[in-house]
């Protein structure tokens, strides 16, 4: 049950009973009515702007309209009190019985509480990470990996059909350079002295095992081949090895994709997929031959002072038209982007989400233009840009590169602080804002460490059940039994905790609609804070303690409340990709 959806329906029902509203119903936009928690909890449990947004089209005063609405709402047995504030806001305080029924519904739903049908029938592709397969993941990839993965989990929880995708950039010139780097390691494995790695090649030792495996399987045969013969063999082996490494890196962060899409498939069979995509745009009138004027600033790689085949992307929102085919007849990298989007659209996705680094900001308009041109505006495209992560240790900056010249890897960070700390902290700031990651801060056991604070709340919930079993021996109560004892929950402090739990479905939907998974991380911290505060009250007020060894019935009722808290924490942490431990060690 979504408290705010429920009361939105009740408020609209009350409005429909007002004569003036019925008379002008066709002129009114009920979609502008907001039902949400009041900014100040002391004002009530639910607030609405209904009178504010409807007064003008109804030709009346907001406060006067609010008084009429309030009179209708007072007839609702679940409304304990209702009042008007300021220019016409309506604040509603709910009856204890409503909170108790809501708690029973939460307990009955368990970890499914908060699931939504918001995205029902909509298919979404979330593409994230998509790092070049040229080496291990570095720390710069962490944030996009976590944001993309958590967003996909969030959308799935909100009812969308979601596929997590990784685009393997395995068709560019950087792959040729990588293959030549591996071939050098292959020669080294055969016993050749290769000396210092030449400038322009990849120097990392992670390529040594790939060269050794080629030497073991092919002996000197590759060495005796010209480059055009050994290149495809070495490329395939190298890309496979790099993707194994990348998948292992991502798995260490609890990131798992459904699809790994190879760019090379777009170039297969004479680049049939790219040709088809360009032909479709041509049919729609978006393709022409021409020469682009030199853009201001640094010239892009695909600019030529010659006639090229161009995408008329300025007609669909881009800053400039984009080359598809160079003057020599070869396809641009952008042409592959067009074909890739068409592939996604043809797979039936209603929305494509790209999670990219902030350095890809210049790609946004061209990708949006591709979406409009390819889908005729039928498919939605969203690009989320992730700002940089800066590493610190006890407040002091940590160099992002090692003495060897290699970057700090994703695996380095995960092995030092754990995947839970990395994931939750990467979500604890909006993706469009820079993030400071302090190794010391994310491992300390304090309120200042969000991941510890939230996980500790779940562990405390589990400890309550252990205490109850110790107090009552064979205590083994099912959620169904918990739900039958909610009448024992009525203290204002307990109801405040229920109210915080009641925000969860709204947070899920709001975060999914805005595609902002950090909202969920913030909410989990707030919920944990509310639970810890209630726990601490029990130290000074014995009547609020979860376990009363002299009152089994009261204990079972409060265990139901703890069960609901634990369920929401577990669900929320699962969406973020973070564990919900039963105890903290």
From Swiss-Prot:
One cellular component term (GO) for this entry is:
cytoplasm
- Report the protein name in the record: Arginine--tRNA ligase
Its annotated compartments are:
Cytoplasm
* Organismal lineage: Bacteria, Pseudomonadati, Pseudomonadota, Alphaproteobacteria, Hyphomicrobiales
> What's in the keyword line of the UniProt record?
Aminoacyl-tRNA synthetase, ATP-binding, Cytoplasm, Ligase, Nucleotide-binding, Protein biosynthesis
The gene it comes from is argS
Q: Name one GO molecular function term.
A: arginine-tRNA ligase activity
Query: Which SMART domains does the entry link to?
Result: Arg_tRNA_synt_N, DALR_1
Quaternary context: Monomer.
Q: What is its EC number?
A: 6.1.1.19
List the Pfam families.
Answer: Arg_tRNA_synt_N, DALR_1, tRNA-synt_1d
Q: Does the keyword Cytoplasm apply?
A: yes
- UniProt keyword Ligase, yes or no: yes
Q: Where is this motif: 'HIGH' region?
A: 131-141
Principal EC category: ligase
Q: Which InterPro entries match?
A: aa-tRNA-synth_I_CS, Arg-tRNA-ligase, Arg-tRNA-synth_N, Arg-tRNA-synth_N_sf, ArgRS_core, DALR_anticod-bd, Rossmann-like_a/b/a_fold, tRNAsynth_Ia_anticodon-bd
Instruction: Using the UniProt record, give the first listed, main subcellular location.
Output: cytoplasm
Q: Which family does it belong to?
A: Belongs to the class-I aminoacyl-tRNA synthetase family.
What NCBIfam families does the annotation carry?
Answer: argS (TIGR00456)
Reaction catalysed by this chain? Answer: tRNA(Arg) + L-arginine + ATP = L-arginyl-tRNA(Arg) + AMP + diphosphate
An example Gene Ontology biological process? arginyl-tRNA aminoacylation
């Amino acid at each position: 049950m979504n408290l705010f959806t429920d009361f939105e329906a009740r408020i609209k029902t009350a409005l429909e009973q007002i004569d003036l509203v019925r008379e002008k119903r066709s002129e009114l936009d009920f979609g502008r009515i907001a039902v949400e928690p009041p900014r100040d909890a002391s004002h009530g449990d639910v607030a609405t702007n209904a009178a504010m947004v409807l007064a003008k089209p109804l030709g009346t005063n907001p406060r006067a309209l609010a008084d009429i609405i309030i009179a209708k709402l007072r007839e609702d047995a679940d409304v304990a009190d209702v009042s008007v504030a300021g220019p016409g806001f309506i604040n509603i305080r709910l009856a204890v019985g409503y909170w108790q029924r809501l708690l029973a519904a939460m307990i009955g739903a368990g970890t499914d509480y908060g699931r939504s049908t918001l995205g029902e029938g909509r298919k979404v592709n979330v593409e994230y990470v998509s790092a070049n397969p040229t080496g291990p993941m570095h720390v710069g990839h962490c944030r996009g990996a976590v944001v993309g993965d958590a967003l996909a989990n969030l959308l799935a929880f909100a009812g969308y059909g979601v596929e997590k995708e990784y685009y393997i950039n395995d068709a560019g010139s950087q792959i040729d350079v990588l293959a030549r780097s591996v071939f050098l390691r292959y020669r080294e494995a055969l016993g050749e002295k290769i000396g210092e790695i030449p400038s322009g090649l990849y120097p990392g030792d992670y390529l040594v095992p790939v060269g050794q495996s080629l030497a073991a399987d092919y002996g000197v045969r590759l060495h005796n081949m010209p480059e055009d013969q050994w290149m495809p063999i070495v490329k395939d082996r190298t890309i496979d090895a790099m993707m194994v490494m990348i998948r292992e890196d991502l798995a260490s962060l609890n990131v798992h994709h459904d699809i790994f899409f190879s760019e090379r498939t777009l170039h297969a069979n004479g680049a049939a997929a790219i040709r088809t995509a360009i032909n479709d745009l041509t049919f729609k009138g978006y393709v022409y031959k021409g020469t682009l004027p030199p853009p201001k600033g640094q010239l892009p790689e695909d600019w030529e002072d010659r006639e090229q085949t161009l995408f008329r992307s300025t007609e669909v929102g881009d800053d400039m038209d984009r080359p598809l085919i160079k003057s020599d007849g070869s396809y641009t990298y952008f042409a592959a982007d067009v074909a890739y989007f068409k592939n996604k659209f043809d797979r039936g996705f209603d929305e494509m989400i790209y999670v990219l680094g902030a350095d890809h900001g210049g790609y946004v308009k061209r990708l949006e233009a591709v979406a409009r041109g390819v889908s005729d505006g039928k498919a939605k495209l969203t690009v989320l840009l992730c700002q940089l992560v800066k590493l610190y240790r006890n407040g002091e900056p940590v160099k992002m590169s090692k003495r060897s010249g290699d970057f700090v890897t994703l695996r380095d960070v995960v092995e030092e602080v754990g995947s839970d700390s990395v994931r939750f902290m990467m979500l604890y700031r909006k993706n469009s804002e820079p993030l400071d990651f302090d190794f010391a801060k994310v491992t300390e056991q304090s309120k200042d460490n969000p991941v510890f604070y939230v996980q500790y709340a779940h562990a405390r919930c589990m400890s309550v059940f252990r205490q109850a079993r110790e107090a009552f021996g064979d205590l083994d109560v099912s959620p169904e039994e918990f739900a039958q004892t909610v009448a024992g929950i009525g203290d204002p402090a307990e109801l405040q905790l229920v109210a915080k739990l009641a925000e969860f479905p709204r947070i899920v939907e709001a975060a999914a609609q805005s595609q902002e998974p950090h909202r969920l991380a913030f909410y989990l911290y707030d919920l944990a804070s509310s639970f810890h505060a209630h726990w601490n009250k029990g130290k000074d007020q014995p009547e609020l303690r979860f376990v009363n060894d002299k009152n089994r019935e009261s204990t079972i009722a409060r265990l139901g409340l703890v069960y609901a808290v634990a369920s929401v924490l577990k669900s929320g942490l699962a969406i973020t990709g973070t564990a919900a431990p039963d105890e903290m060690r």
